[in-house]
Amino acid sequence: MQVSKYFTHQLSQFSGYPSIVSERDACGVGFIANLNSKPSNKIVTEALNALSCMEHRGGCGADNISGDGAGVTIQIPWDIFISEGINFLPKLQSNQSILNYGVRMILRSSDDLDKIKKIFSWALDEYQLDLISWRNVPVDKSILGEESKFNQPLVVQCIVRSNNLIDYKLDKHLYLVRKKIEKLVSKLDINTNKQFYICSFSSKTIVYKGMLRSEFLVKYYNDLSNSLYVSNFAMYHRRFSTNTMPKWSLAQPMRFMAHNGEINTLLGNLNWNKSKESLLKSSIWSDYYDILSPITNLENSDSANLDSVLELFIHSGRTPQEALMILIPEAYKNQPALSLFPEITDFYEYYSILQEPWDGPALVVFTDGKFVGATLDRNGLRPARYTITDDGFISLSSETGVSNINSQNVVTKGRLGPGQMLCVDLSKNLVLDNWMIKQQISQKFPYKEWVNKYQSNLNLLEYLNDFTFDKVQMNRWHTAFGYTNEDVELVIEHMASSAKEPTFSMGDDTPLPILSEKPHLIYDYFKQRFAQVTNPAIDPLRESLVMSLITYLGPKGNILEPTAIMAKSIKLESPIINENELAQLNSFNLSVVTVPTFIDKHLSTQTFVDKILEICSQCDSYISQGIEILVLSDRIEILPVDKIFVSPLLIVGAVHHYLIKKQLRHKVSLVIDTGQCWTTHHFALLIGYGASAICPYLAFLTVRQWWHNSRTQKLMSTGKLSRLTIQESQDNYRSAIEKGLLKILSKMGISLLSSYHGAQIFEILGLGQDVVDLAFSGTVSRLNGMTLNELYEDSLKSYNLAFITEIPKKLPNLGYVQYRPSAEYHVNNPEMSKTLHKAVRNNDNILYSKYKSLLNDRRPTNLRDLLELKTDRQPISIDQVEDVNSVLMRFCTGGMSLGALSRETHETLAIRMNRIGGKSNSGEGGEDSTRFKSIQDLDTSGVSRTFSHLKGLKINDLASSAIKQIASGRFGVTPEYLVNAKQLEIKIAQGAKPGEGGQLPGKKVSPYIAELRNCKPGVTLISPPPHHDIYSIEDLAQLIFDLHQINPDAQVSVKLVASLGIGTIAAGVAKGNADIIQISGHDGGTGASPLSSIKHAGAPWDVGLAEVHTTLVENSLREKVILRVDGGLRTGKDIIIAALMGAEEFGFGTVAMIATGCVMARVCHTNNCPVGVATQRQDLRNRFPGIPSDVVNFFIFVAEEVREILAELGYKSLEELIGLNDLFKVKDIELSKTKNLNLNILFNSINMNRNLIPKLKHKTVHTNGNVLDDILLSKSNIINAINLQSNIVQDIEILNTDRCVGARISGLITKMYGRDNFNGNLQLNFVGSAGQSFGAFISKGIHLYLKGEANDYVGKGMNGGEIIICPPIEQKTSSSNQVILGNTCLYGATGGYLFANGQAGERFAVRNSNGYSVVEGVGDHACEYMTGGLIVVLGTFGRNIGAGMTGGIAYFLDEDNTLKNKLNTEIVKAQRLLTKESEEQLKNIMELYEIKTKSEKAKLILDNWSQYLAKFYQIVPPSEQIQHLLMLIFFFSKYC
């Protein structure tokens, strides 16, 4: 057993963060095993070597020596113990005698060793175990870095013996002993408890781990370098933590598993687990309940908690494989292969009733000493490559090439696909594949029989047709439940007519609800959280096969002891039910009761809390009577004047948490029947806080009212609205909500509603702790805010408006969405915009002062508006302050794409920023190469021939954006684009719609835009929600590495959106070698976004920036990065406030657009911008009013204002102010809603000592160190070939640690010759295993030949040249059945050839623009979002082919007639080859492929062409179908 827990991590715990919302990590992970030989030291050394080969996937602290974590799980080193002469050793000569011994590995403080030993003795005596020996594990402290040395524990092993138990019975006993010891230690002083951790306690395995880098693990633990250490398997892990002061205990492996990824649903998993713990009282663990509980711990990481649950399953008699099938199930609903294994589907169906999945990207490697294996999440979001040899060696890891394997011995090279599993039975020396494992497990019980007998399905029933209210009555009900005119007309009616959420543009410029003087529902105080960096968002439309809204009603039984009756449930395809379906619940075999949620309006002696608790107690009583479904309802026949309903969100949260505390939650489902729920955000919150189903009766009634309205009927009759029945309109509304729910789930990376249910994935802005404790326990509310009483009084005011004598015939329009005079305040109001236009066009300081006053004197809108400045110095003369140019250099524009903006706007912004020494941001979509050179062709009238559409130009103006953005769609990202940047920005998220992708509507894709983006005109362009090469923090580090390779002179920035826990993410980004981190606020602008995202996702940059700066300072990382902020910056005062919070650079988006001429028409998404700013229509572009000098004037005004404030404060430069948040004080302002707002998080999160604030001396650009490309470029023959444009051939050995090979060479060539002007040829022949991003961003003239294999991201962004990959000549097995490439290859390619004689992984050719490729097999999601190029697949293929594919051609050889079942037909269609031109196209590229690769499969096809031609399908999107139709017409007209 090993023990460690030095918990001195310095991650800021802002306002009670539970660790689980701030701990995130990723890593490299794997296992090796040897089936056909005895345990050997070779396995130990091979595992340590493999671990070292994945060092680049791990992170390290600020000292660059302390690792985020590294470790191995191996067999117990009995031979080492024998050699040390421990007194029990004679008994270890027989293998049988070893079975009754266990070893505990402990990390702990040396100060309390005696106390710990006494506790051990007590526990061992109680459980009748003999203490054989204590052993201090020999370690070398000298190799530790400062951080790991400061936290170093004492590492101790405890060897014990049982006299009557062996094997698994002993391990179960040791589990109980460990839990008992942990309970006893927890009662000691807090420091002893926190510094104690048992790594492992087993008769089979032991864990060695710590805050170490890979190569230092073996140096630290002397045991690992001892030749006596033998094992026949090993599991290893290298951690990349975004918590920069990791704990020794959180290094991995855990006790049974090692995890690469992130569990997105953790809070919900823990809540449900806590609720179900009481079931242990009536199970095999009944005698040990008090010892085992709690199973999970809010303070532990996601991996540690998953390991704890897995451990319970294993000790309850499950194998790790079965347990992980239950906890991390595959997406079985849309898996064609499962048609052959219906029993596996039955298994998943049964357990989906009982267990919510632990959802998120996950490669989990596991062992219990008998089995070692791995499983992958349902989406296949982590790489997992394996190799099996003919002498029984097997290696599985995050990368291929980490083990020394002779190619001649290879039997199989494969990968785990989504939801797949592989394991080794160590006792039987068997390798078990995915279907073998699952088929065996699923036949354990008659699951199908159980489900068929006890599960019912809720059928979809007709909606109601009646509508009995007049307008006044309807308005009274709407008013009582908080509806406004916008809610009805912009939201509900839009959904009813279109089946879509409403879309708006330009972001949210209204006050935060807690600052607003207008009434807000409790829903509005919640912000949706979203995935960024540490896990990816999902596309709910193109990847719907992994998404599901299925939910189950009924009690949850003890999953550890499955029985038939536990299948008793009602299955709902959607959580949204209508009135008839709600009534139908009473007809099933579950007992249902309705609990009214109206309470007396006049509370008298009872408080509001008492009334809520009374309802909770009533629910408790019903459960004791056997009720299994509780319907919490505010439906009432007549609105009562003397009563008021409790908000459905408040009551469902209160009941949910009340029942969790009572350990009753698993016994009942909660259904909400409410009038106060109509937007997707409302539904998401109700489900997130415990509702299983919702009937929005008033929303349905509103739809019926709209449909019956004479105006609606007239619009339908005239064709201005689609003709709909009353049933269709209500179904549209439900459909829109369902789509919106899927989007909200997917932006967090969650696939299943059952995982989102109760997961509480929100942040609260403006509710007090008493509200949180009652109904939202575990949700972070950093600002405090409205109390329960204040909420009650607020809701009472709104409710009472329904009973005024003269109720208006029309609901009030409070202007929450669209600006209206006298309604909700909008910062970007007409007066502000017009004043700014006049100021910049006339260069008028007085008008700018008016503009400034309009903003500085406004009512509080943002949190920073509640702060004012103070100073510790005397004012100084402005002449002593840094000059205006120094300030201007810190300014930049937000990323706004050419496509969303007109060419005129985009180029004007770039020119003006270059004039002032600032930086413009290209946004996504590329740039015309003519912009990369300064303008020299002005005529006498100041008109440029190249830029004839622009006004106000000067000689030497430069239209190139200094910041070139790399977004998820990779549109326009070419080597030429990248090398012409001063900064390269990776856009992870956008403030107005974080966690979502984007679309450029086809009507905005003009021929010019299509040329820049390498696509076809008029075709809608889709940007995926995630970067498909960033699914984790180490993936981001890889992309940063790649960009530093292609352009070593450019800084790399990473754009994040403020949200809870952004500090830890930023810490990971800093360790990932980013130069700049940009924090965007939730109020950023957008060309188009769902209204619910604009209003309810993300957080203010104020809190995000404060958190990031504080976290980086605390962890000695602040000086490594520049911090930039954007989102709603408008004045010099904003700049000063942001600087005091830690920002060094400042981005302007919306206000820069206004200065350019934007009139805030908010129609960007329609292509109808009236002033030509955000349109591609030439007639409207001709109206563009802006000239560069307008925007220059604006920025000079702001910079001069900054200088004035600096002088008033007594500071000479912005540099002096950065991070000095003690210069803030809170304004004396009385808010209309509460006096309880706490702003401490903005200016003294760590009680900042000025001495802690680093002097920010940033290196110009971070480097990658010496890499293989540098070695190649140091060779004179290669440099000469580049300079002379000649030909060269060079042979090179390559390892998996050689990453992004070819990119730096490509960057140099492109910098020298441009896109297509290099006429030489560099042929580089590699042998070995290439690291990630092999051939990324290569250009014309570069030819990479690899004999071996490659990892993920091969050829991403390639623009020319060729990549040829073939297996080693000595490999005996057929190459067409072997995996030779990783995931996400050819991502965003804009040219060149990739030929691979083997199979590729998931998402092959994702967003391919113009790459040409032939491979012999692909995984799921091939050709996703493809817009051009040619792909040929000659082997097996996965699901969801061609999703979002709008251009290009693909040919698939369909030998088993499965293509049509695996094709996403939303856009593309599959057809046989219909024309001679198609056949020639396919044959030509196959002939070239066969010449280049010597592929046996290609030769076979070509030799039997007519036979195989009939088996090919052509995948054709609409843009290509037109072209092929024209070819067919020509063919038939000529030959028929």
UniProtKB/Swiss-Prot annotation:
EC assignment: 1.4.7.1
InterPro entries: Aldolase_TIM (IPR013785), ET-N_metabolism_enzyme (IPR050711), GATase_2_dom (IPR017932), Glu_synth_asu_C (IPR002489), Glu_synth_asu_C_sf (IPR036485), Glu_synth_centr_N (IPR006982), Glu_synthdom (IPR002932), Ntn_hydrolases_N (IPR029055)
Names of the cofactor(s): [3Fe-4S] cluster; FAD; FMN
Entry binding sites for [3Fe-4S] cluster: 1158, 1164, 1169
Family, per entry: Belongs to the glutamate synthase family.
Species of provenance: Antithamnion sp.
Descriptive protein name: Ferredoxin-dependent glutamate synthase
Recorded superkingdom: Eukaryota
Cofactor note: Binds 1 [3Fe-4S] cluster.
Any GO BP annotation: ammonia assimilation cycle
Subcellular localization, as worded in the UniProt entry: Plastid, Chloroplast stroma
Subunit structure, interactors included: Monomer.
Location of the active site: 27 (for gatase activity)
Taxonomic path: Eukaryota, Rhodophyta, Florideophyceae, Rhodymeniophycidae, Ceramiales
Pathway(s) the chain acts in: Amino-acid biosynthesis; L-glutamate biosynthesis via GLT pathway; L-glutamate from 2-oxoglutarate and L-glutamine (ferredoxin route): step 1/1; Energy metabolism; nitrogen metabolism
Glutamine amidotransferase type-2 domain boundaries: 27-427
Residues annotated for FMN binding in this entry: 1105-1162
UniProt catalytic activity: 2 oxidized [2Fe-2S]-[ferredoxin] + 2 L-glutamate = L-glutamine + 2 reduced [2Fe-2S]-[ferredoxin] + 2-oxoglutarate + 2 H(+)
Primary gene name: gltB
Residue runs in coiled coils: none
Keywords: 3Fe-4S, Amino-acid biosynthesis, Chloroplast, FAD, Flavoprotein, FMN, Glutamate biosynthesis, Glutamine amidotransferase, Iron, Iron-sulfur, Metal-binding, Oxidoreductase, Plastid
Gene Ontology cellular component annotations, sorted alphabetically: chloroplast stroma
GO molecular function, one term: metal ion binding
